[in-house]
Amino acid sequence: MIIEDFEALKHWLSKTLEPICDADPSALAKYVLALVKKDKSDRELNALCIDQLDVFLQKETQGFVDKLFDAINTKSYLPQPDSTSTAVVKLDSFEHQEKEIKKDEVNKEEEKEKKAPRRLNQSPQPSSTRHKDTRENRKRSNSDRESNSIQNSFRSGLPEQKQDVDAAPPRLNSNKVQNAKNTRSRDDRKRDDRFRKREYDRNVPRRDSYRDRYNRRRGRSRSYSRSRSRSWSKERQRDRDRSRSRTRSRDKDSGKPKFDLDRPDPVDNSYASGSSVPHIGSAHFPVPTLSSTITVITPSHHGNSSAENWPEFHEDQVDHSSYGRLQMQKKRCRDYDEKGFCMRGDMCPFDHGSDPVVVEDVNLPGILPFPAPPPVLEGPPPPGLPPPPSLLTPPPVNLQPPPVPPPGPLPPSLPPVTGPPPPLPPLQPAGMDAPPNSATSSVPTVVTTGILHPPPVPPSSLFPSAAAAAGPIPLFPETYEADGYNPEAPSMTTTSRPLYRHRVHAQRPNLIGLTSGDMDLPTPREKNNMRIVVDSESRKRNLGSGDCVLPSKKPWFDKSNFNNRMNPGFQKKPLFPNENTKLELRRIPPELNNISKLNEHFSKFGTIVNLQVAYKGDPEGALIQFATHGEAKKAISSTEAVLNNRFIRMYWHREGSSQQLQTPGLPKVVHLTVPQQPNLSVMKQSIKERLGPVPANNSEPSVAQNINTETTQNIAKVPVKERLGYMSKTVSAATEKVFSTSTGLTKTVYNPAALKAMQKSVLYPICNDNGDAQKKKQEALKLQQDVRKKKQEILEKRIETQKILISKLEKNKNMKSEDKAEILKTLETLTNSITKLRDELKAVSSTGNVVKNNKSKAQMQKELLDTELDLYNKIQAGDDVTELRKKYTELQLDAAKRGILSSGRGRGVHLRGRGVIRGRGRVLHGRGRGASVHAVVDHRPRALKISGFTEGDREYLLPHFAHFGEIEDCQIDDSSLHAIITFKTRAEAEAAAVHGAQFKGQDLKLAWNKPVPNASSTEVEDADQEEEEFHEDSIVDDSLLQDDDEEEEDDNESRSWRR
């Protein structure tokens, strides 16, 4: 069936089904719509609908289906357009509403006008004409506001005429609305603005960005200019009204309560000019002591101000980076990505990702310093800056005081309490926009006045340890400059702050997981955007002569790399010298990692001097050296994929890169070469650990012990290579005590992933030496192999010549005696040389075997574990592992033969208690108290013949049986698919026979493999066995009797341990 509008039909169906059906009408409407959509004839659809809907509608089914098909055919389900009539009705109702609202507003204004003379009794020259003008203005504003509300409601009532935000509203034909719109005055618009601002201040959480407000104000100012240009007489009238109302508002403000100044009266319709700011600034307001310095939002929040109030507030003073978060995405921080940390911390203008680790490190060496604040006099603001908004408005009333810290001893890292806390430093000037930062401060927005008043001294009961702290001689000089009050590290001093010193962020220390996307940092420093950062170094406490925990540091400015743009800690690029000609390849598939393939690809870029496959023992690595740097650069900058494989990585090869990566600015994790400089472990501390009372001097060793234990726990897991003794030197990690204070502004952001890479490079600087040694070994082996090949060739040639000479002698029997003697002499020398060469070759091969056999158990185990790890990683990555699995099986067999795959890795047979396993007269005792077992040669078979496994399971067979004991030998026949595994002892072979039959869900066929002995040896063995059996039985009987005596003695002993 043809349906024009599915949504309309669905709406009609749900409306029709609601009275006749108990089910959900909307769901049933969807179901009916699905039935009607089917590609069938009308008759079939009718029958189908009746059949399917009978369950839901029962008696109403036939009527509903007829009605449905009739509606679809006649299209009566489509909505009928009757917008013109509804519009007319709505317009009439709006006009009626407008009259009622106008009456109410006029009554309210008259009541306010009666009250106005009482408040204006201090004005110098009240006049009746002024009241008349203001009444006329109010009436005009009321009519204008009502016309606006009519337009808005009319626009929302017509869905067909929805328009964009920037589009003009639809024009009404009503003369009344048009006249009201034309007569709208600037004063009434300003009152609307103030009303909107007041609503904005009440709903603080839903604050929009400064740009939105600024654009909105600009849009309104454009409309003002349009309306202003329409009439010269209106402009003159407006100027007269403005001058009158300005004097009236000044008088009115003087009589207001002090906290109502930021809420202007509705009748105030004037703009405060820039010249009026200093007069208002003379008012004094009490400053509540709050817990942190806060940033001011914008001057547009305050009642008496708007964009025109601030003549010095220009576009170029606004820091667009702080609020234009969508206009340009931040670039990634190079230091954070490459080195693993950024010493600028949350003051870095670049992106540190979604979850950086932020650590407060005021006293850490290598932190990027910031210049000390310039000397500032307490007085008016700098000439370039507009007056701070703190001179205009007092703090909002709705703020609550900060939480008081609990009573208890102060941390010793804080200075002694000698007076009341310093007043809050003033905040950012009005020209700088800083939105509220929920990630960095937990205190609500505060505006403070510019005049410093010492706040009242807090009650001494809150800080009982204040007197005790001030009692002894202070360790720190009085020049220490205290920070603003911080509830997490409270401190009180009498030193006051300079008036116009601004803090960019007031952050709690050691915040972990700060999102740098939430930090809106002002990056470009333009004309009057002055950012003064306090140097944390100047506020550090200087230790006394008696305390020698921290060494005296060299000042930042004396260091050679201070403020040096060529500092290697902040290089933009890793510098590769122009003479570098080596390229390193990684992730090459093993089948492509051969000399011919690599030479074929890289020879097109230039002359290859050296080519190494399986570089540094990595089967997927290679090293290629070109003749010149240009050729290497051409190869690395080529867009063509290496061997047509995009997964192959190519790098510049750097000699000794692991030592070069460590820079002076790095927090050194482990030092192998310079043990004098202590390393710093990155520790996560809780708030209690940071703020809790630290014991005095006598507890320093215990603190150092705790730090040592934490360091050992925090060091990354020891890799397999190091566990197996691969590292020749032990890593000694010294720790340094770090005193963390909350007064610093610098924070270091750590990137754990990059730091791991750095730790690897620092932990293994010996790898280069090992690589050189391996190179030398490989070269020596190559030479040996070449010599051996040449000797083999010489040997073969001499054997051939010997054969030729012998055949010549046999054929030419009538040869002369002289020739025959010469040939015999030559044959003799040939045989001597051949035997000599054979001996030499045997010696070389035997020494090679000795070297192979001399592999230590640890090396074998390391190699096996490395291969197992590579196999696991490749299986996880989905790569081809056939070659690697073969190598792993060979290593397993070799390890099993040497007894490395011992029973300790799996289930073994353990004897305990008083059980006896007896066979052929031999007894193994397993008494719980460790009685010695008599060792006897066991001639029973230790080899198992295994069959019944598939070809795919052949590789896993050896590891399966290696769990039961040490394997001496393993022979797997590929053709008949049976294996013979020989265990070291009979007991292990029996355990494998009992428990090893189940393999991968199938039963293996196991049998003892008995070797066929010689007849002579069997007779001798039988005789020996008889003697052994007789001798052993007597020994066993004696030992058994002895054990019985011991048991009797045990029975007589006291059983106190059993209770």
Swiss-Prot record:
A zinc finger (C3H1-type) spans 327-355. Residues 214-231 have a biased composition (Basic residues). GO terms for cellular component: nucleus. It comes from the Eukaryota. SUPFAM superfamilies: CCCH zinc finger, RNA-binding domain, RBD. Residues 581-655, 942-1011 form the RRM domain. Keywords: Coiled coil, Metal-binding, Repeat, RNA-binding, Zinc, Zinc-finger. Residues 771-873 form a coiled coil. GO terms for molecular function: RNA binding; zinc ion binding. CDD domains: RRM1_RBM26, RRM2_RBM26_like. Residues 98-114, 130-147, 184-213, 232-266 have a biased composition (Basic and acidic residues). Residues 434-443 have a biased composition (Low complexity). Residues 375-428 have a biased composition (Pro residues). Residues 172-182 have a biased composition (Polar residues). Pfam families: Nup35_RRM_2, PWI, RRM_1. Gene3D superfamilies: 3.30.70.330, PWI domain. Residues 98-275, 375-443, 1010-1059 are annotated as: Disordered. May be involved in the turnover of nuclear polyadenylated (pA+) RNA. This is RNA-binding protein 26. It comes from Xenopus laevis. The lineage of its organism: Eukaryota, Metazoa, Chordata, Craniata, Vertebrata.
